[in-house]
Swiss-Prot record:
Biased composition (Low complexity): 46-95
Lineage of origin: Eukaryota, Amoebozoa, Evosea, Eumycetozoa, Dictyostelia
Protein name, as recorded: Putative uncharacterized protein DDB_G0287599
GO terms under cellular component: extracellular region
UniProt superkingdom: Eukaryota
Coiled coil: none
Organism this protein belongs to: Dictyostelium discoideum
Keyword set, alphabetical order: Glycoprotein, Secreted, Signal
Amino acid sequence: MMTEFGSAMTLVTGLVAYGAYVKSKRQSNHYLLKTNNNFDVEKENFNYNNNNNNNNNNNNNNSNNNDNNNNNNSNSNNNNNNNNNNNNNNNNNINDKQINGTNIFDSNNQIKRRLFD
């Protein structure tokens, strides 16, 4: 009788111990799942923030490029204005050097050899 009772108690103790082991295993797995999920969320946030930073950098670069383009355009406009002014000055100089309305200089600002062809 005592032997049967002892073996039954051993069996119960074994089952309780096994149940506790399974429960602790489940909890640790649950904890692992939670931490893995958190890690994924953190990773997504990190990637999202990186993408935002990249977009901001691209936007800044684009605005810098636009500024540079505007500067280039204004520089080329200034150059065009300077060229136009120079051309006007050259034309004025040539127009001053005429005989009876005929330019005595050719387009290279050289004196024409034959004025009246």
